[in-house]
Amino acid sequence: MRRWQLRIYRIAPGAMDAFLDEWRASVRPLRESLGFEVLGPWVGEDDRFVWLIAHDDLEAADASYYASPERAALDPDPARLIEEVQTFLLEQR
């Protein structure tokens, strides 16, 4: 069953443009290369960055992403600009 994860980040004040550039150049293509469906991003009030990812085996694919040498080699790593993370697992019914 395809599962979705909603991710909401609070980005450091003044860093949204840098975060978006780095995320688009590195995180999104890496996720997509590992079979993730990526929707978004959306930017909201209070420096909020919102996106959705989906995969048929979300937990295993997420573990592969974080263990990948490509993820470890991200430079600059956009995660340094994230101040708060909220994640929600979703299933379509």
Which residues make up each language-model segment?
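Short, structured motif recognition centered on aromatic/hydrophobic residues
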Residues: R3-I8, F19, L30-R31, F49-I53
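Active-site rim elements
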Residues: M16
